[in-house]
């Protein structure tokens, strides 16, 4: 798989075939941040307080990652509040739903039901364990002629995981790349621990530029008791991450705002070093 990680976000935005990827890179450049905060909180108030720039992390992040199904009080107020903050303060919303089912089911999970994820989440993710049909089904939903947000929706394929003993390796990771290539207008890229440029897969078109999100970024810990394995912003970006994802390292810090600033600074400096701008 080809990699354009040595190019600046601005250069990649100018030539990227995916409209949401262009928006994502533009947000990163405008805010000088490649930080995604994983907001693993359990109430609407906690979520909105975390995102609100007047009291929280909004100025320092490019993306907020939600686990909306762990909120104990999810309602339309949750979505209205989150959307308002995202629009006003220039960050994208990534719902970490990890879709993994047959196509007919994931279409309903994405577009219908109580959560109505398609209406508010710019970015979603899925595993390809069910096969290519899961990506095709999600793409059909997001790109339907009667769906008004198609150009503002995109998918990350879960190509690797940071948990100890993960089985998302080898042939599974290669298949993730192969499937992604078939849906360039919908698949933004991957959740992975590194650039997938060395993964053996089908031949890459010259215009290919998949975005890499790396989870498990933490400045103060190397892991937890449940098998999570962490890396620093510098090591993640050095291995090819375009956007670094940190949860407890930020929201569970003694001062989450100061922690977010630190991740923003270190992540951005690592990016500048990678592209030779520092």
From Swiss-Prot:
Question: What's a GO biological-process term for it?
Answer: 'de novo' UMP biosynthetic process
What pathway or pathways are given for this protein in its record?
Pyrimidine metabolism; UMP biosynthesis via de novo pathway; UMP from orotate: step 2/2
Going by the entry's taxonomy, the superkingdom of the source organism is recorded as: Eukaryota
rRNA-binding as a keyword of this entry, yes or no, is no
Which EC number(s) does the record attach to this protein?
4.1.1.23
Residues binding substrate = 40, 65-67, 96-105, 230, 248
Reactions catalysed, semicolon-separated, are:
orotidine 5'-phosphate + H(+) = UMP + CO2
Question: Which UniProt keywords are given for this protein, alphabetically ordered?
Answer: Decarboxylase, Lyase, Pyrimidine biosynthesis
Looking at the keywords, is Magnesium present? no
Stored Gene3D superfamilies:
Aldolase class I (3.20.20.70)
InterPro entries of this UniProt entry? Aldolase_TIM, OMPdecase, OMPdecase_AS, OMPdeCOase_dom, RibuloseP-bd_barrel
What SUPFAM superfamilies has UniProt attached to this entry? Answer: Ribulose-phoshate binding barrel (SSF51366)
Q: Which GO terms describe its molecular function?
A: orotate phosphoribosyltransferase activity; orotidine-5'-phosphate decarboxylase activity
Q: Which residues form the active site?
A: 98 (proton donor)
Q: Which family does it belong to?
A: Belongs to the OMP decarboxylase family.
Query: Which protein, by its recorded name, is this?
Result: Orotidine 5'-phosphate decarboxylase
Q: Which gene encodes it?
A: pyrG
